[in-house]
């Protein structure tokens, strides 16, 4: 089926952990299953709403992080007034009923806002430290550590073609969308 899993030793249950086709192979030949790392980042970092790892044939992993605008405001990293406008666009893009024209306009505004937040060094450092904390501490091997992050406010959604109808990230589409912008 292409699914990856493990047996829970305590119960004997099969736990699905990811898909074989999602495997990232670094330039040093190490194979990395991104799902457990992505799950750790989203659960440990309040600022990150969604994440996808990239790094195929590269030297290290890069996390494409969709940030939560409300969490940014609560952390004092973004003005609450600006966040109100961003949240309207964020919710519009996440609405599967959003018409194509409105969704494209909302995505464009979110991309512009994303370009602005990338110049906020304090915000970037806080996101990087949160991602590094989530992937360090012995839970993951050395080559599974995320070395760089790319932040955006545009969510992975059905309306912008980055999520399937079953809410799975379309990894190829996300990688193509950000290939020119990733370090």
Give the positions of each predicted feature.
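A short N-terminal helical cap/helix-turn-helix that marks the beginning
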Residues: 135, 139, 178-183
């Amino acid at each position: 089926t292409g699914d990856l899993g493990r047996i829970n030793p305590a119960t004997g249950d099969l736990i699905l952990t990811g898909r074989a086709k999602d495997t990232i192979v670094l330039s040093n030949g190490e194979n990395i299953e991104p799902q457990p790392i992505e799950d750790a980042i989203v659960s440990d970092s309040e600022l990150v709403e969604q994440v996808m790892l990239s790094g195929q044939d590269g030297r290290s992993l890069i996390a494409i992080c969709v940030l939560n605008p409300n969490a940014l405001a609560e952390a004092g990293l973004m003005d609450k007034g600006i966040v109100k406008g961003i949240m309207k666009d964020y919710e519009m893009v996440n609405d599967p009923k959003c018409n194509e024209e409105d969704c494209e306009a909302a995505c464009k505004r979110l991309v512009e806002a994303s370009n602005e937040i990338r110049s906020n060094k304090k915000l970037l450092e806080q996101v990087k430290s949160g991602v590094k904390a989530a992937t360090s501490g012995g839970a993951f091997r050395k080559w599974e550590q995320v070395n760089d992050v790319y932040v955006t406010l545009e969510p992975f959604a059905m309306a912008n073609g980055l999520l399937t109808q079953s809410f799975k990230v379309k990894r190829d589409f996300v990688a193509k969308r950000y290939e020119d912008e990733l370090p």
